[in-house]
Amino acid sequence: MHRGSPRLWFETNRLGSAGLLPGSRFDVVALEHGIKLVPNAHGQYGVCSKERNGRQLPVIDINSREVLAPLGEQQVVRVVVRLDAIFVLRVASEQAKAERIERLRTKLATGEQLASASIAHGAGVLSNVAHAGFKEAGIELDMKVLCEIDAAYVEQSLNCNPVSANATPLCAPIQELVQDEWLMRQVPRVEVLEMGLPCSGASRAGKSKRGLSMMEDHPEVGHLIHAALVLIQKLQPAAIVLENVEDYRVSASAQILRSQLRDMGYQVREHVLRARDFGSLENRVRWALVATTDGLPVVESVSPQGSEPGITLGALLDAVDTDAPCWSSMEYLKSKEARDLAEGKGFAMQLVDANSTSVPTIRKAYNKGGSTDPYVRHPTDARLMRKLTPAEHARIKGVPETLISGMSATAAHEVLGQGVVCAPFRALFAELARCFKRLRDHGPVWIGECASAHRLNGTIG
């Protein structure tokens, strides 16, 4: 732009590589995302010259708004000089941003299902919630691809999770997937991407167990943000939702993700979702990063929904006989509790019953029986307690029980314990879907060029 009007100015000997020398002529050909300058002895435009250090430099000056319209009034452009022509194109980040919005608008206008993808899929709890939230707002998702390292989880999702019915499973470490050139060529573009990268190195327990100074020190999962970004570049989603433990937001990986998404043309918002605020009994807190392509309304907030008046754990418990073998005195845990208290560690057992209005966080390794995990108190014998069943765990988190159908107790608790409580994320995805509908009804609202283009503009002057 020059004084409010578009202007394209070249002053360089590199024009000569395309046959555009001082005194020669050329035509301008409009392209979908730019223009092409083609040498033509009888062309509409001429190449001027300017003397510098005793040499004549070719100069091209185009200031027609109509001719430059395919560039969309970009401040920074990509220039490709070939032997037969010069291509002036939108920078890659701007072109990708425009393509994402146009693809999404087209599908929304026709009522077509929106394609989705899942990274670190597990058995698909977050995927199931994403579909439910979008459906609540009147939009259908169709999951095209899921990435998951655990073959058993993949089989469980394909067999028991209805949202995975049409998905292509990619069962391998994502850092391996992104190195497979053939496979990456098969990856489709999608409108919605949800992912829950492993939190082993970000959680306080994970850091403490391995003695990590930072999350990225974890040898297996500390570097996965790179592979995730490679997949994001390939999938080109209009919107991205990442969920993780709250501590993930202060990691180097989170900062890398924020900065790269910004430079890819996304607007990033972050939310700390407390499940209790959304009617859940479980005191589970998760962090969510929501990235929406510039042009889309952003998810500024996720409205909590108060719990149902008077709801207690009893409504979610199985009918377990008082003499069932699952009841136990768990003397080993009581002994450990006594030792911990004597040593001043402060670890204590957490007992719940039918009248409880809250439940402590139920973790991935719940079936191992940790000393601070929640246990159900026997209704008549104060000496006895039991573990929550997988079905009860699912109900507490709001997860459809069919998703863990046929799984062992250990595997079911793993899937649920590393997953999300459904209510807050269903509300988040429903709000994201409403942002999509506002785009459909009112069109895009651009905040401007990608941050990377702004910095290029500042560097070039």
Task: Annotate the PLM regions.
Residues 105-236, 246-249:
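Core alpha/beta nucleotide-donor-binding catalytic domains of modification enzymes
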Residues 4-6, 14, 23-103, 336-461:
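C-terminal target-recognition/interaction regions appended to catalytic cores
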